[in-house]
């Protein structure tokens, strides 16, 4: 794999990974990107841990067998937390995951009061305690699980209207504690809602989107792999799935297809899942 021809597959339950894909595209403009959206499984937060791991393993095993990428970016906090170890043990290729950027929040907070805006499934998982113990730097964490924000992000992607008042209602305690000065986004979908979140919050805070950090890690691995490639190896042609989004759910309508195209994925193909 060379920096100029890395074949990278981005995975999420929906459109949450598009921010990560955009950052990768800027950092590695010659890389080939494809996208797998497990739309039939959205939202992942509604699944049990066991069901989610089974789902992610099944979808990605079939996608990897079909597409043969050099690297897979798991642009989903929940899937990263639960399934990353199993994926790495089953496949001989790099997997990049994402976790809530609590270390970043702790590093920028002046009040030592930080927020986490995530899905209820993420907020309820015990790994947050371990993250805070390792990276919290003496901060107090105020976590809120928003039930509808991921769906609102999907609606914005489709061109539907989402009201600031609806987003404000999803902020929970984060909008009530005046000392919070940094909020980590614990769901990649939420980056699409940043304009709404800034308007909805009753005071200015730093909104921390992990998309760029995830992309930087992917770029580092791609560049390292390129540096160790044989010096006389030739660049490869882009695979047939370049700029293609694969979805597991219903066939997207024309407006949704156009929205994917506007995000750099003008081609669409179904990803048939035998069982999950």
UniProtKB/Swiss-Prot annotation:
PANTHER family: GLUTAMATE RACEMASE. Its EC number is 5.1.1.3. GO terms for biological process: cell wall organization; peptidoglycan biosynthetic process; regulation of cell shape. Keywords: Cell shape, Cell wall biogenesis/degradation, Isomerase, Peptidoglycan synthesis. GO terms for molecular function: glutamate racemase activity. This is Glutamate racemase. PROSITE patterns: ASP_GLU_RACEMASE_1 (PS00923). InterPro entries: Asp/Glu/hydantoin_racemase, Asp/Glu_race, Asp/Glu_racemase_AS_1, Glu_race. It catalyses: L-glutamate = D-glutamate. The active site is at 76 (proton donor/acceptor), 187 (proton donor/acceptor). Belongs to the aspartate/glutamate racemases family. It is an enzyme of class 5 (isomerase). Substrate binds at residues 12-13, 44-45, 77-78, 188-189. It comes from Granulibacter bethesdensis (strain ATCC BAA-1260 / CGDNIH1). Pathway: Cell wall biogenesis; peptidoglycan biosynthesis. Provides the (R)-glutamate required for cell wall biosynthesis. It comes from the Bacteria.
